[in-house]
Amino acid sequence: MGSSSFLVLMVSLTLVTLVAVEGVKEDIEKAGVCPADNVRCFKSDPPQCHTDQDCLGERKCCYLHCGFKCVIPVKELEEGGNKDEDVSRPYPEPGWEAKCPGSSSTRCPQK
């Protein structure tokens, strides 16, 4: 009877531990969306993260440039925004026209 009681106790403790660990793993998605990734990869890099919780601060775990990495997310489009707009493109700061020679944005390097 002693060994079967020990076995029941061990199984019970294992189940309680597994349930407790699953409760801690609650994956809360951080704000923003992952930037667009147009890079074609022949081989994926090892992941640097698996969920947003693996990343510090506001960074999200996103697939970018051939592997999962912690990156600064882009803001989601506001309701009624242009759905075809590439939100991952780094737009220059306001007032860039005054700082760039000429009137064409193609003549001014973007950030």
From Swiss-Prot:
Its main location: secreted. PROSITE patterns: WAP. The keyword Signal applies. This is WAP four-disulfide core domain protein 12. Transmembrane segments: none annotated. The lineage of its organism: Eukaryota, Metazoa, Chordata, Craniata, Vertebrata. Keywords: Antibiotic, Antimicrobial, Disulfide bond, Protease inhibitor, Secreted, Serine protease inhibitor, Signal. InterPro entries: Elafin-like_sf, WAP_dom. Disulfide bonds join 34-62, 41-66, 49-61, 55-70. One of its GO terms (molecular function) is serine-type endopeptidase inhibitor activity. Antibacterial protein. Putative acid-stable proteinase inhibitor. Residues 1-23 form the signal peptide. One of its GO terms (cellular component) is extracellular space. The gene is WFDC12. Residues 80-111 are annotated as: Disordered. Pfam families: WAP. It is found in: Secreted. GO terms for biological process: antibacterial humoral response; innate immune response. Residues 27-74 form the WAP domain. SMART domains: WAP.
